[in-house]
Amino acid sequence: RACIRKYWALPRRDSIMHETGLRILIRKIQLVAAQYDKALTPVFSYSKEHYMRVFLRNDKGKNKADEILKLHGMLNGAGPMWLGKLWDINIIDKICKNSLKSRIFSKNNELMKFLKTIKEESKINAVGFYDLNGICEKNKIKKLQKKETIKNKIRKLGYKASDTHFKSEGVSSDIPLNKLIKLLKNK
């Protein structure tokens, strides 16, 4: 009820709820900005533990604001939400390069792994990700292959694949679900 009241959107408690929540938050911010003819585009977004952070670029103009609103929609019964990109690849590259140069940040292995994951994830043009354990359970696939093996098989089929920062068992990919299930069933 709080999500409907505060963000004018319907949430879902499922494996991608953190990404869904982030996208609902972005949409709400964009709606408020659009009232003032401002178009806000995410350049860096993440959900970690119980926190969500969104950094946005502000472009002025009613036409630009209208274009942003066209990228709102539903996903798996949740939303409406932002269905555009969560990251600007150029900004992610700069953040990663600057972090590597920094004596403080470069020694923080957890931070560097987190940034690397987001950098890879930002290259995939997909909304949502695949929860491998959930897919295997739902489709009665008894043995799950290693995640790295699955990602390599997806890439061999010509699709993109990376880890997702939203969930450790998740894979972000542009592969259709039916092809992923077939891949998981074939060992």
Question: Which sequence ranges carry the predicted segments?
Answer:
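SAM-dependent transferase fold signal centered on methyltransferase-like domains
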Residues: 1-187
